[in-house]
Amino acid sequence: MIVGLTGGIASGKTLCCNWFAAQGCYIIDADLIAKELVTVGGVVWLQLRAHFGETIFYADGNLNRALLREKMFHNQEIKEKVNQIFHPAVRAEIEKRIHLYPHAFTLLDVPLLFETQLHKICHMVIVVDIPVSLQIARGVCRDGVNSAQMQRIIASQISREKRLSLANFIIDNSNSIAQTYQQCQQIYQQILSLNAA
């Protein structure tokens, strides 16, 4: 069973993902894969270097993620090129891990699950949701960005309404951690029951 887990920035995906990991689910983390692929000499690192030269790299060869992110927000052409490089490489690695490590319950932790069409390889999708105002407040505290930057990031993602309409299950993470975990437990049991049927 392959289950996608997604949600807007600062919605609490990691909190929920950690709960599922504690239950023994096999977690495939798209952000972690992306970081691995941009390590010096990695497949995406090589492609970024070939396309952008040294302009987005530190002197030691590491990718300057903050600079690249800023360029992507201000230039649609750069954003599209970076996505053309990243998304196929991340998808290929996710598919490789699914096939190499078959598991009764594999959770794909993918922030841009719908934008990258990875929901199509999932049997079910869980969306972690919070109101946009709370998303902005949490993101400002967590990421050290200002409110305008958070609004820009949110606007660059699929709309909350669209994300919710594509979900099989929704976790409301706007209350206590205990309440979020309770929802995780209920959804986990429902998915296991469906898988057993």
From Swiss-Prot:
It catalyses: 3'-dephospho-CoA + ATP = ADP + CoA + H(+). This is Dephospho-CoA kinase. One of its GO terms (cellular component) is cytoplasm. Belongs to the CoaE family. One of its GO terms (molecular function) is dephospho-CoA kinase activity. It is found in: Cytoplasm. HAMAP family: Dephospho_CoA_kinase (MF_00376). Catalyzes the phosphorylation of the 3'-hydroxyl group of dephosphocoenzyme A to form coenzyme A. The lineage of its organism: Bacteria, Pseudomonadati, Pseudomonadota, Gammaproteobacteria, Cardiobacteriales. The gene is coaE. It holds the Pfam family CoaE. It comes from the Bacteria. Residues 2-197 form the DPCK domain. It comes from Dichelobacter nodosus (Bacteroides nodosus). Its EC number is 2.7.1.24. GO terms for biological process: coenzyme A biosynthetic process. ATP binds at residues 10-15.
